């Protein structure tokens, strides 16, 4: 596989906390999928997880900019879910899924957060070509 795009984003947890304090329901409904909302709302302190999801969505959005039509991808067109082993996985929905349709791609996502910041890296790879190793 060959890397075709990388996206990176960092979000301050304090900024995410402020958004939650001022606009909790509105900001969560606008930015998160229903599955993400359930997860974030289940946490005692949702700000770090919310910040990580914002960073992830922005990192994936940046990686997808190599495709025509990607500029209009919305917050809820990119989801983040946790796999059984705890790793994050990006899920492309709606317009994001349409932008990459009929392409054989792998999207890797890594998230990290501390008390102060959340960061995400998205790496987009194309499928290996037949007969090429």
Walk through the language-model features, giving the residues of each.
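Core catalytic alpha/beta fold that binds nucleotide/phospho-ligands
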Residues: 1-133
């Amino acid at each position: 596989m060959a890397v075709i795009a990388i996206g990176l984003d960092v979000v301050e947890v304090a900024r995410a906390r402020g958004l939650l304090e001022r606009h909790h329901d509105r900001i969560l409904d606008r930015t998160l999928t229903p599955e993400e909302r359930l997860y974030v709302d289940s946490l005692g302190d949702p700000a770090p997880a919310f910040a990580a999801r914002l960073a992830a969505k922005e990192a994936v959005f940046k990686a997808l900019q190599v495709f025509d039509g990607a500029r209009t991808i919305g917050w809820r067109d990119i989801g983040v879910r946790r796999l059984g082993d705890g790793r994050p996985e990006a899920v492309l929905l709606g317009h994001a899924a349409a932008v990459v349709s009929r392409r054989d791609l792998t999207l890797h996502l890594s998230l990290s957060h501390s008390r102060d910041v959340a960061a995400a890296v998205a790496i987009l790879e194309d499928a290996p070509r037949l007969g090429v190793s």
